[in-house]
Curated annotation (Swiss-Prot):
The gene is Ciao1. Its main location: cytoplasm. InterPro entries: CIAO1/Cia1, WD40/YVTN_repeat-like_dom_sf, WD40_repeat_CS, WD40_repeat_dom_sf, WD40_rpt. It is found in: Cytoplasm. GO terms for cellular component: cytoplasm; cytosolic [4Fe-4S] assembly targeting complex; MMXD complex. Transmembrane segments: none annotated. It comes from Rattus norvegicus. Belongs to the WD repeat CIA1 family. This is Probable cytosolic iron-sulfur protein assembly protein CIAO1.
Length: 339
């Protein structure tokens, strides 16, 4: 297990600052990082080395907490503690801030694009989730403000193929939203974590959702459609989500991020104990009660809290991580034999 994660490269991405989050572009050729220095950096390869291709420093007045690429790869959205979200347009190696989205009362904690590229979601410490519509002229309009959470909303993520939105909060819950008529509504609340839910990730099929928490567990939730063979109760025509697996006893501190590889199904976590862990579903495990094994555990992946893990969308096994130590690390994950 010790050789399952091999360091490929390490770069001082945000020196003297925290590096908060990472996002690969859709082709897996560029990685965006953001940090407490108010900057966004774009990383790419030259030969065998990862180098900084661009620095986006003009958009925000405070910490940049999250970044997200549009599905077409031509835009990057950044969420900041200055209560704004910037939309950057890519022009070869340069990026220009073309729009600043305002409206949240305080820190914007996360931003995510829908798979169509026509919708954007943001969430904030003001307890709200906003859904924005993007038109052909690149104009952004808020079409819904969702106030389902009772505390700070930490993370938003879209289903990989449907317009289904999920959010994670300091109120210990995960909520799911869909469009009904002309508005967005909360269609499910996932309860079970005993403390803040920091991050969530859909599996490649979108039928399962992983959540990670301050309670040091990862929970796997499965979607059940009305009339399902397992007899899981559903409310009307809305699917039901049920916790089918809890990964506990593996992490010694808060789990800040969880990432589900869209190519292999491997599940990576970023933890406050400075470690990165990878889990794989056991072969032949029951889909209704899946079991997962720890296949990689790198104890000193960083010198401080690990904030984010991100699988490359095109190159299986390439994992990036970032930390309070300001560094970004690139790892090669080797799947154990027999899986």
């Amino acid at each position: 297990m010790k050789d399952a994660l091999v360091l490929q490269s390490r770069v001082p991405a945000h020196p003297d600052s925290r590096c908060w989050f990472l996002a690969w572009n859709p082709t897996g050729t560029l990685l965006a990082s953001c940090g407490g220095d108010r900057k966004i950096r774009i990383w790419g390869t030259e030969g065998d080395s990862w180098i900084c291709k661009s620095v986006l420093s003009e958009g925000h007045q405070r910490t940049v907490r999250k970044v997200a690429w549009s599905p077409c790869g031509n835009y990057l959205a950044s969420a900041s503690f200055d209560a704004t979200t910037c939309i950057w347009k890519k022009n070869q190696d340069d990026f220009e801030c073309v729009t600043t989205l305002e409206g949240h009362e305080n820190e914007v904690k996360s931003v995510a694009w829908a798979p169509s590229g026509n919708l954007l979601a943001t969430c904030s410490r003001d307890k709200s989730v906003w859904v924005w519509e993007v038109d052909e002229e690149d104009e952004y309009e808020c079409v819904s403000v969702l106030n389902s959470h009772t505390q700070d909303v930490k993370h938003v993520v879209w289903h990989p193929s449907q317009e289904l939105l999920a959010s994670a909060s300091y109120d210990d819950t995960v909520k799911l939203y869909q469009e009904e008529g002309d508005d967005w509504v909360c269609c499910a609340t996932l309860e079970g974590h005993e403390s803040t839910v920091w991050s969530i990730a859909f599996d490649p099929s979108g039928q399962r959702l992983a959540s990670c928490s301050d309670d040091r567990t990862v929970r796997i939730w499965r979607q059940y459609l009305p009339g399902n063979e397992q007899g899981v109760a559903c409310s009307g025509s809305d699917p039901s989500w049920k916790c089918v697996c809890t990964l506990s006893g593996f992490h010694t501190r808060t789990i800040y991020d969880v990432a589900w590889c869209q190519l292999t199904g491997a599940l990576a976590t970023a933890c406050g104990d400075d470690a990165i862990r990878v889990f794989e579903e056991d072969p032949g495990s029951d889909p209704q009660q899946p079991t997962f094994s720890l296949t990689a555990h790198l104890r000193q992946a960083h010198s401080q809290d690990v904030n984010c893990v991100a699988w490359n969308p095109k190159e299986a096994g390439l994992l990036a991580s970032c930390s309070d130590d300001g560094e970004v690390a690139f790892w090669e994950y080797h799947q154990p034999a027999g899986l």
